[in-house]
Amino acid sequence: MKLYKVALAPNPTKVMLYIAERAELGTDMGIEQVTVNTVKGHHKEPEHLIRNPFGTVPALELDDGTFIKESLAIIMFLEHKFPNKALITGTPEARGHAIDIERIVDLRIAGPMGGYGHATNSPLGYPADPERAESLKDNMQTPLNH
């Protein structure tokens, strides 16, 4: 299997941390990690769009040549493919709460946090947008307090 990723982006980082945690627990998944240079636009090139038509990362290439394109779907696939020493365990309620927390962080904190970074000091050179930054900061407060 191959994981197509970019350093520092939240969704690929989530998957990379998951793989690293599982490796610490002794589960070698044998996943090759391939960096996609998003700064140079490689994620929008035809080669990557075959992997993920949305032009995003991560994308996990399975042994049969198909791809899983969303971070949580990749993690859940790996949980089931390598069940020994899984991270999302316990009762159905405990698993539900774990996924609930993941979704809150992903949708209500990490996404707006990335937008805030781009609105204040974008590593990609986007112009500053103080009003948007303030709005994103306000929107993150409730989930952060949760």
Per-segment meaning from a language model:
Residues L136-H146:
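Short, intrinsically disordered, charge-balanced linker/junction segments flanking boundaries
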